[in-house]
Design a protein with these regions (language model features):
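Binuclear metal-dependent hydrolase catalytic cores
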Residues: 1-113, 179-196
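Short, surface-exposed beta-strand-loop junctions and turns on beta-sheet-rich folds
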Residues: 7, 119-120
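Thr-Gly-centered strand-to-loop micro-motif
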Residues: 92-93, 113-115, 135, 166-167
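Binuclear metal-ion centers of metallo-dependent hydrolases, dominated by the metallo-beta-lactamase
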Residues: 120-196
Length: 196
């Protein structure tokens, strides 16, 4: 949030409903509402028993004041089928975050794969012919639910993207020192990073 949200952002796609990925939803909604011209985005059907509904119960309660307390966002459940979003095809693919299945996404020649420590066999074809791979790499030590830097570099070696950015990085990795030891086409991501 420190880098602000570009007022041109029209959609946010979530990989999974863990707290570190969804807890900024209210802030994102407020900033996007301020930039939005015209009516708010219509709401989709919301599943009352979902993790989203437990965390954001007020957003799923029809009695909550529509304009003041409920996010003015449409919630759409995503499966593994490709879908169109704002004229662009998004191709979801399965990743494993320990024993928890999560989603990665491919848009054009960019793939985003965070919070993962394994890539199932059926997902590898969606990582072929990439320009840019954004990949989880928590820190240097082994971890039960995240790739570490060495494992991420093995994935990058197999995928062969033109460039790669490591994301979901811990404070244990010094930005300058880590970038200095990475291959030239691999860098740590940073707040405010924009991919064309």
């Amino acid at each position: 949030m420190r880098e602000q949200i570009d007022p041109q952002v029209q959609a946010i796609v979530f990989t999974h409903a863990h707290a570190d990925h969804i807890m900024g939803l209210d802030d994102a909604d407020l900033r996007l509402q301020a930039a939005r011209a015209g009516p708010t985005v219509p709401r989709g059907r919301r599943r009352r028993g979902s993790r989203w509904a437990r965390v954001y119960s007020y957003a799923f309660d029809e009695r909550t004041d529509e304009l003041h307390s409920r996010p003015q966002l449409e919630f759409v459940r995503i499966g593994l089928e490709p879908f169109e979003l704002l004229g662009v095809t998004v191709r979801p693919f399965r990743l494993m975050h320990g024993r928890t299945p999560v989603l990665g996404f491919r848009v054009g020649d960019i793939a985003y794969a965070t919070d993962c420590n394994a890539i199932p066999a059926e997902s590898w074809p969606l990582l072929a012919d990439l320009d840019t791979l954004v990949l989880d790499a928590l820190w240097d030590e082994p971890h039960p639910t995240h790739f570490n830097v060495a494992q991420a570099l093995e994935v990058i070696e197999r995928v062969q993207p033109r460039r790669a950015f490591l994301t979901h990085v811990s404070h244990r990795l010094d930005y300058a020192a880590t970038n200095a030891r990475l291959p030239p086409h691999v860098r740590l991501s940073h707040d405010g990073l924009r991919l064309p």
